[in-house]
A protein has these predicted regions:
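Acyl-thioester-dependent acyl-group transfer interface
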Residues: 6-196
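Short amphipathic alpha-helical segments
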Residues: 1-2
Length: 196
């Protein structure tokens, strides 16, 4: 995203910060029996107006941000405010349709729309041995956000990582650029598309 923005926006002062949502499975930090999605986000961000950043520096930034925030203490603080709001006497008696409008307004202000995309990695999928002969590949498709046209789901099956890029716009520039970066890194890549 940084390289593509540099290519499209020549003046560094006009470039926007790049922020990616990385979901974190809270079940690993807080034992839970719920079947519902129990996740929070870590949002590494880089401001290109502060100067160039190498790929290695970017990887280090994400690694350290994940290390600092992916723990019980930080995650508990993140969702404590949500739990506290549920206990508010005013909110408890408020009609649901008003709560829904308020929650949408809050989400639009501080939610996913404040990022460039969400990159969710399920990791390596393991299946029972009896199922393995019947599975050729895995895909992980996540929907796009209302105000950010790209999302990316990653899953590994066997020795292959499947990276599913989803977009709500016609232009595949980000995907093309991502392919070029992987190719430049010397990684074997096979591209598939459902575009007609």
């Amino acid at each position: 995203i940084l390289e593509l923005q540099t290519e499209k926006v020549p003046n560094p002062r006009h470039r926007k910060p790049v922020k990616v949502l990385l979901p974190v499975n809270l079940r690993k930090l807080f034992p839970s029996k719920t079947l519902r999605n129990f996740a929070s986000y870590i949002t590494p961000e880089i401001d290109p107006r502060l100067g160039a950043c190498s790929f290695q520096e970017l990887c280090a930034l994400v690694h350290h941000k994940m290390g600092l925030e992916n723990n019980r203490w930080t995650m508990r603080a993140k969702f404590a405010a949500n739990v506290a709001s549920e206990r508010s006497p005013v909110l408890r008696v408020m009609p649901l349709f008003i709560k829904n409008i308020a929650m949408k307004a809050v989400f639009d202000t501080v939610g996913e729309c404040k990022s460039c995309l969400c990159l969710s990695n399920l990791g390596r999928v393991e299946l029972p041995d009896v199922m393995v002969p019947y599975v050729r590949r895995m895909d992980f498709i996540i929907g796009v956000q209302a105000k950010a046209p790209h999302n990316c789901g990653v899953v590994t099956w066997g020795d292959t990582a499947y990276i599913n890029c989803i977009r709500s716009i016609r232009e595949p520039e980000l995907e093309y650029h991502f392919y070029r970066v992987l190719h430049r890194l010397g990684l074997p890549v096979k591209v598939e598309s459902n575009m007609r």
